[in-house]
Each structure stands twice: as structure tokens, then as C-alpha cells.
Amino acid sequence: DVYTANVPDMSPTRDGSLEHVVRNMRLLDLAEDGSRLRLWYSAAFSADDNRPWYPQWIFDECTKKFGPPVPTGQIANDYRIMNDCNLEMWRQAGKWQSDCLNYMIKEHGVEVIFSHYHLVDMSGHTYMNVMKERYDSRYTEEEIYQCAIGTYKACDEYIGEFLHLLDEGWTILLFSDHGLVSRNEDFDPLIGDNYGVNAGVMCELGYTVMKKDKYQQDT
């Protein structure tokens, strides 16, 4: 049961050529006789594509020093993947990202950083709906709660990579784009939730109306 980072691989591109990529992997289960195994592997990230970077020399310099960009993503409904794979992958990504940013500050005099770390959002989508025990729950609330604890510990580790900058006169501002809550129902309401349509906006645009109760309040 070892998490293995930056496993090299090849992936086909749209033009039919092959691209160098990296994945993260973890062997979750292995039968004693070798007859069966359960292996998790992440999505593939390009190890060579510098097009999203500007100026592009930053990509070349950072990857030479800290390795390739870290694959990230989300898989839900499996406790070991959520807790032992997704979370470990995001922890690895946070360290890589913070190493690159601190390097640019120290070596190239960067004075302003806008850092987006998608861990809390992506992890929340994997476990938020199952934080409340339901008729089809595969895990207890306490087990899923530990996923949330792990998420915020990893986020704290990421923020901690920059706290030394406070002693150098930097100001650190933390923002969240939105919140996620565990639904009360045993089904997705679809309208007004984070996976469906925001009813308020649709009402304002005149594309939908809400049912009313006897007091003429939206239901």
C-alpha cells in the first residue's frame, strides 16, 4: 500500500502523436497468490505542455527544479480512494504548487501571487452528499467526517507553506468562492443545488416559477 507519484506514461493526442504524461498510482489490494489486484491511478497530466504558462520559461524552470505538474481530480463513493488517493494527490499538488510559487518569489522577485488551490472544492464534491447517513450509505458519518478533516488539514499545510512570508512584510488574504453543504433529503433536488440549476436566477430571468404554499411562499 504505497502511493507512487509521477509515474511516466504515454498518451495519444488529437493528431495521433504520443505525449509524455505522468500519473499517480496506488495499489489498494493484492491477493496473496497474485490472482487479483485493485489499482488506483489518476488522470494523466502532460509533462511537456508549456502552453498554459506565461512566460513559458517559468514552466521549464519550475519543472526542471520540482518535477512535472501534479495530476489532480476527484473520484467519489469509495472511502479509500477519497481518503488515501484523492487526498494524497492534492497534498502532493499543494506541495508542488507552493514550492514553485515560493521559488518564483525568492529567485525572481515576484511581489504579487494569486494562488488557486482547488482541494476543498473538489474534495467536497466527493464526500459532501454522503456526510449524512442515508438508506444507501456505504460508510458511517464518522468515516466521511474524517475525509473532511483530512481535506482541511491538507489545506492548512498548503497555507502554512507561505506563512514565513508574513515576517517579510507580505499580506496573505484567503478567499472561498462558495460553500457546500450536505443535503437533508435522500435525493438530489436538482433545482437550486450545486449540481443543478439555481432557481433564483431562473425566476429573475422569467424562465421558471416556484410552487407556492397556502401563504404564497415559495416551496
Which role fits each region the language model picked out?
Residues G160, D193-T219:
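Substrate-binding rim/cap in mid-to-C-terminal beta-strand-loop elements of soluble/periplasmic
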Residues C100, M104, H116, T151-A154, ...:
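Generic, well-ordered alpha-helical scaffold segments in large soluble proteins
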Residues G150-G196:
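Metal-dependent active-site segment of extracytoplasmic phospho-/sulfohydrolases and closely related
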Residues L28-A31, N102-E107, H164-L165, I172, ...:
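A general structural signal for short secondary-structure junctions and capping/turn motifs
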Residues D1-R138:
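His/Asp/Glu-rich, glycine-adjacent segments
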Residues H125-L165:
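Extended hydrophobic/aromatic segments used for targeting, binding, or gating
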